[in-house]
UniProtKB/Swiss-Prot annotation:
Nuclease is among the record's keywords: no
Gene name of the encoded protein: proA
Protein name: Gamma-glutamyl phosphate reductase
Pathway recorded for this protein: Amino-acid biosynthesis; L-proline biosynthesis; L-glutamate 5-semialdehyde from L-glutamate: step 2/2
Enzyme class: oxidoreductase
Domain of life: Bacteria
Reactions catalysed, as given in the entry: L-glutamate 5-semialdehyde + phosphate + NADP(+) = L-glutamyl 5-phosphate + NADPH + H(+)
The enzyme's E.C. designation: 1.2.1.41
Record key words, sorted: Amino-acid biosynthesis, Cytoplasm, NADP, Oxidoreductase, Proline biosynthesis
Length: 419
């Protein structure tokens, strides 16, 4: 069969399995997660051997060090996947929960019940642990999942998908609720994007090119985990010691993640004192600053002149764009032009300007006097997440179990008819 035909067969199996998953009990889903955690611990050697084969091919192909790091599985990473399974067991099952039940004047009770989305297709790059992390969230939320990982991790992903299917069967759930696309052929993604009658939603997670390709081809809704061009605005009169701590944490703690700071905006009144201070602090942790003409002479060593393309760029590195602005309005205009809808924060002691920023900054998380790094499911109290959506429909921000469900109206009556 052709790749397109193979993908249609896979999607039909997933659709059938999704009906069983929607009706599955919470106990069965938790038994699956417990069983999978055990398999990840007892069968790790086979997975690590498959990963070693992927790494050998990647090195031979000249893969760079950061991508090799993302591709690598270790015993600690395997332990982390098993731990994630057990943590999700502890999360409440959203499926079947009825919210906002209210009486109508005619005696009807009207509410909303959480229901699975159906079949989710997850397309991702490099990190083989996403195979487990994505699948267990989708499955706990009562969905079936089709997984399409990067070609560089195919052997690792096949080994992990085998454990997923084994654990599903052992708990009485359909193995076809978790299927991995077993080919590196790029035609598979194009084919999956056209199966809107069988696949309910696509979730691409990876580089900007991957996400744009899926969005342009998909005939079903796409939840975009888009790039994270995150800004921090330092207001006039801000607590500079606190702002320094926030900026260093947001940029340097984990510079390669999507909620890391990429651009620092500083009010012109704060610039003469704050920029030399933050320049020293960032230099100590190895950050290179790409600065506008007004900020460059104030930052000292470690700063270079910014190019226009540095603003709006996701560096994934110890690099930070810096710009002086004349007002909160100018800061927000810059954010609206260059931001990606991910995370924006303000450091200020002025309540009115803080509230203005919260209302007007367009992002999935907007913060006052805190690091951008808090836009994370665990940090926001949502539990594990499948990604951070920068789309306003159907979910905006971290996508946890609840965000992998939808709601249907339920109406309880006693014989009422419409007149």
């Amino acid at each position: 069969m052709s790749v397109a035909a193979d993908m249609e067969v896979m999607a039909r199996k997933a659709k059938e399995a999704s009906r069983a998953m929607a009706a599955a009990s919470g106990a069965a889903k938790d038994a699956f997660l417990a069983g999978l955690a055990g398999l990840l611990e007892t069968r790790r050697e086979g997975v690590l051997a498959a990963n070693a084969a992927d790494l050998e091919k990647a090195r031979a192909a000249g893969m760079d060090a950061p991508r090799l790091d993302r591709l690598t599985l270790t015993p600690a990473v395997m332990d982390g996947m098993a731990k994630a399974c057990r943590e999700i067991i502890a999360l409440p099952d959203p499926v079947g929960a009825i919210e906002s039940m209210r009486p109508r004047p005619n005696g009807l009770l009207v509410g909303c019940m959480r229901v699975p989305l159906g079949v989710i297709c997850m397309i991702y790059e490099s990190r083989p642990n996403v195979t487990i992390d994505a699948a267990i969230l989708c499955l706990k939320a009562g969905n079936a999942v089709i997984l399409k990982g990067g070609s560089e991790a195919l052997a690792s992903n096949l080994a992990l998908a085998g454990l997923l299917r084994e654990a599903l069967e052992a708990s009485g759930l359909p193995a076809d609720a978790a299927q991995l696309v077993p080919t590196a052929d790029r035609a598979a993604v194009a084919a999956l994007c056209k199966l809107d009658e069988l696949i309910d939603v696509m979730i691409p997670r990876g580089g900007e090119g991957l996400i744009r390709a899926v969005v342009s081809q998909a005939t079903m809704p796409v939840l975009k985990h888009y790039k994270g061009v995150c800004h921090a605005y330092i207001d006039s009169g801000a607590d500079e010691a606190r702002a320094e701590t926030i900026v260093v944490n947001a940029k340097a703690q984990r510079p390669g993640v999507c909620n890391a700071l990429e651009c620092l905006l500083v009010h012109v009144d704060a610039a003469p004192t704050f920029l030399p201070r933050i320049g020293d602090a960032l230099r100590r942790v190895g950050v290179t600053m790409r600065a506008c003409p007004r900020s460059l002479p104030l930052l000292g060593e470690g700063a270079v002149a910014a190019m226009p393309e540095d603003f709006g760029h996701e560096f994934h590195d110890l690099i930070l764009a810096v710009k002086v602005v004349d007002s909160l309005d100018e800061a927000l205009t810059h954010i609206h032009r260059h931001g990606s809808g991910h995370t924006e924060v303000i450091c200020t002691e002025n309540h009115d300007r803080a509230m203005d920023f919260l209302r007007r900054a367009d992002a999935s998380m907007v913060g006052v006097n805190c690091s951008t790094r808090f836009n994370d499911g665990g940090e926001l109290g949502l539990g594990a997440e499948i990604g951070i959506s920068t789309s306003k429909l159907h979910s905006y921000g971290p996508m946890g179990l609840v965000e992998l469900t939808s709601a249907k109206f339920v109406v309880l009556g006693q014989g009422q008819v419409r007149g």
